[in-house]
Amino acid sequence: MCVCLSIAIAIAIAIGSHKRSLNPKSSSVATMFLRWLGIVFFATHIPATLLVDAQALLPAYVFPKFARKMLENFIEQYNDPLMSAAMGSGGSADRRWFLSLVATELLIQLPFFFVALYAFVARREWIRVPLVAYGGFVSATMVPILNELALAEGLGAGKRAALLMMYVPYLVVPAVFVVWGCRRERLFAGGTDDGGRGSRKKTS
């Protein structure tokens, strides 16, 4: 319930933050919230990808022992049908499609995480179009993943709900970025843009 409420608030802020009718203080608060949402999202996604998700594709010896143990405990506790099948420790169906999505996460998304994290910290406006492209791509890839978790056989209601609560933010937050980027010409109002082009436009 808390996750759903947070998601609803984030989407509402993303949609409403573009409106000219908002007073400057309210608009500033919305922008600050979305900026910090992005910083936290990308900053936490980097270690999650490198230490957890990458284990589905790369050999075990490249990961520290604590990371391997953490994933083992996660699979044992929540019986994640996707990660367990990807790691060869169970699963009821062929998960090659899931491995292909993990590959795109490592090859495409991971480099973008560093770029986006820098852009959000430094308030770089050039991130808007790449952010929309990223958000649309990731939102689409999360649909089959959530569908698999929702319909997987042999998964108890409690574990299914817990897994969905963990995975759903990785659909919703990118979707919020899409809405935000499409509704705003400048994401970080009053922030620093790339090369100061906004300032030159005002003075020309």
Task: Please place each PLM-identified region on the residue numbering.
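Hydrophobic alpha-helical transmembrane segments
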Residues: 101-116
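Hydrophobic alpha-helical membrane segments
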Residues: 109, 133-148
